[in-house]
Structures are given as C-alpha cells and as structure tokens.
A protein has these predicted regions:
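Bacterial N-terminal signal peptides
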Residues: 8-16
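A domain-start/cap signature at the N-terminus of enzymes
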Residues: 19-76, 168, 225-228, 238, ...
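Gly/Ser-rich "nucleophile elbow"/oxyanion-hole loop immediately N-terminal to the catalytic nucleophile
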Residues: 68-75, 120-156, 169-170
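Active-site machinery of serine-nucleophile hydrolases
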Residues: 78, 84-133
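Cell-envelope and extracellular/periplasmic
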Residues: 82-86, 138, 154, 161, ...
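Primarily recognizes the serine-hydrolase "nucleophile elbow" in alpha/beta-hydrolase
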Residues: 147-201
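The feature captures the conserved acid-bearing segment of alpha/beta-hydrolase catalytic domains
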Residues: 183-254
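Catalytic active-site module of serine/aspartate enzymes centered on a nucleophile-bearing elbow/loop
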Residues: 254-267
C-alpha cells in the first residue's frame, strides 16, 4: 500500500474514533474535560422543588468534570458537590473547587442547579435538581446507576450534603460511598438518618470531617462535637482530620478522603 493509502486509512480511523466519542444529553464528553448540560425536569421533581412556594423549574443544568481516560463503559465514581445557600453560592460554582482533586483521583465531579432561582433555596429544591440530573445521566448511561457516589460540601454545603445523601440512600437509587464534610459545625447527617431511616447499611459508609485548626466559624471544638454525635448515632467509620488553616476547603484533604472512600469501598 502506498503512502496515500496509509494516509487515508489514518483519516478514516480518526473519523471513526471521533464518531464513537461519548456524549451526554447531546453534549460531547471529553476525558479530562468539562461538560455542561441542560435537561428537562420531570413533573414529580418539579412538584418536589415547588414545595414551600417555590416556582416550578422545568429545566435543570449541570456541570460535570471528567477524569482523564474516562470511559462510560467502565465504573467511575461520582463526587456530588453541594454548596451553601449563603452568598448566593450554587453547586455549579462550588464544583469547580473539587475539579482538580476529584478528577486526579479518577472521579467525576458533579454540580447541579435549575435555570431559574428559587424563592427559598430549600433542600427539596436541591434534591429535585440533583435527582433530575442523575436521571438524565442514567438515561444515556444506564450502567451509571451502579456507580458509587460520594457527597461533598463545605460549610453550609456540608450540612446539605449529608441530608441529600441520606434522602437518596432512603430511596435506594444510589450506592453511597462516602461523605466529605468540611467546615461543619452541626450534625445534620445524624438528624437526617433518624428522620428518614435509610437502613443500618448507611452507618458503614465512611465520613470524613475536615477541620481548619484556626477556623472561627466551624471551630475545632464544633468538629469534635459533630464527630461525637456521629459516633453516638452509630456511624462506624468517622474520621476527623485537622489541617493548618481557617474556614476553608483544603484540596489535599479532598484527595485523601476520596482515596479513603475507594479503599474502604473497594471500587
């Protein structure tokens, strides 16, 4: 075969590889890259979001950061990021913080929201958007329903992360592989566990508490109290780690936590 023939074969191979690239909700997925999607919100999620007088969101949006080498045919854990309600933060904004440590450890990092603002930024609103996003992902990648998920949040987002994780665990729709709770000063995870009773299996899920030694908002004492509360509830794998810093998210702590979740969950 001449040089021209080999060149044509190379072109055809490139085109075939390009056409087989993964997509999600009509958007291209690039390993190691970022994908933003929009999705329809089913009526039952609209009903949930509209509680407390909120508007009915018919369209949601999500940002996903993918690890290098991502292949939807292989199991890839998902790190679900939830932001605080303070300072008009959204989970899409906070997801960017977790991008580098999350993807470096081989995780997808996910943040979700609606395309409109709620009257009250309720947990039901957050749950509805997250649920609709996960449903959209599973529509294109059915196998993702079996992928482990972990919940991560900082400050007020850490409280919300625990609540959302328990609510989804109760539904039986996710395989919970960990909680990363940073800058937390109140144990909403135990409170939600008692309220929703998702089953004792959740008590085996690892919980990483990340505390800044000079944090004046969620003090080291507050973190110790949260750990003691989780221990009393019966959570068996609670780890409190302190770093030199204030009320902040420590990237190296995120990586260590994700490694620990994988080690214990064997995924």
């Amino acid at each position: 075969m001449g040089c021209k023939g080999w060149w044509l074969l190379g072109v055809f191979a490139f085109l075939a590889a390009s056409s087989d690239g993964a997509t999600l909700a009509g958007q291209s997925v690039v390993p190691g890259g970022k994908t933003e999607i929009r999705f329809a919100v089913p009526k039952y999620f609209q009903d949930l979001a509209a509680q407390a007088g909120n508007p009915r969101p018919d369209t949601g949006r999500a940002v996903l950061f993918f690890p290098s080498g991502f292949d939807p045919g292989r199991t890839t854990p998902i790190l679900i990021v939830t932001s605080t309600s303070d300072f008009n933060r959204t989970s899409l904004m906070d997801a960017e913080w977790y991008r580098a440590p999350g993807t470096a450890e081989g995780w997808i990092v996910l943040g979700t929201d609606a395309t409109i603002s709620p009257r009250i930024d309720s947990t039901q609103w957050r749950l509805a958007m997250l649920g609709a996003a996960l449903e959209t992902i599973r529509k294109d990648w059915p196998q993702s329903a079996r992928w482990p998920v972990a919940f991560a949040g900082f400050s007020g987002g850490s409280k919300r992360s625990g609540m959302l994780g328990v609510m989804l665990a109760k539904s039986g729709s996710v395989r919970v592989g960990g909680f990363f709770l940073s800058g937390i000063n109140e144990d909403r995870l135990s409170e939600s566990y008692r309220a929703y009773q998702p089953g004792r299996g959740l008590l085996e899920v690892p919980v990483w508490l990340s505390s800044g030694s000079r944090d004046t908002v969620a003090t080291p004492v507050a973190h110790n109290l949260v750990k003691a509360s989780l221990d009393r509830t019966g959570f068996k794998r609670v780890r409190l780690e302190q770093f030199d810093g204030g009320h902040q998210l420590k990237m190296s702590e995120v990586r260590r936590a994700l490694q620990w979740f994988r080690q214990l969950g064997r995924f």
